[in-house]
Amino acid sequence: GTRLNQLRFSIGDASLTDKQMAELQHKHDLIKNNESSELSDKLENGLPLSVDLKGVDGVVGYKAKKHSKLIDCDKVKNYKVSSFWEKITIDDLIISEENQNRSLVLSPDAFYILCSKESVSVPKNLAAEMRPYDTNIGEFRAHYAGFFDPGFGSPELDANNTKAVLEIRSHDVPFIIEDGQTICRLIYEPMSNIPDKLY
């Protein structure tokens, strides 16, 4: 059958404390921004991840089309991206004349895919999950599919500099996000065993 969900089991509260995550960040550089392990925001209820509105080749992300045809999830690489997503380019951003800061207005209830500024790595003895909603950050939700498996972005798998995909939806009213703004937080959890197969 078609696999659409992922299920994780935990014994009690398996989340690491901020102190434990700070120690791991110092030891393993769990998240890095341009090779720097300095965090973009304070470590509180997880490691902060910020949004990248600089983009690559003029593209900063994608916005889901409201209406599209049905898909067969088992037909991988069978559909055109343009059938389901609109590109968000630099031309769609608000760029400050004063300091060249970049901002994006999120339309109410629209669904966006953006990229984190930071690269993320998950050691093989850990898993990670994005904190899906934080009322201190704003009236939107990120993240809808926030599981990170052991080995994600791991240097030993030649996968370093792997960014996180940020799935974002604004609620009720338009919402402005700025380049480098903290969007969500990453919480690490220890595995009961090291998996035989890494991400």
Regions found by a protein language model. Give the residues of each.
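DUTPase catalytic domain/fold
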Residues: 1-199
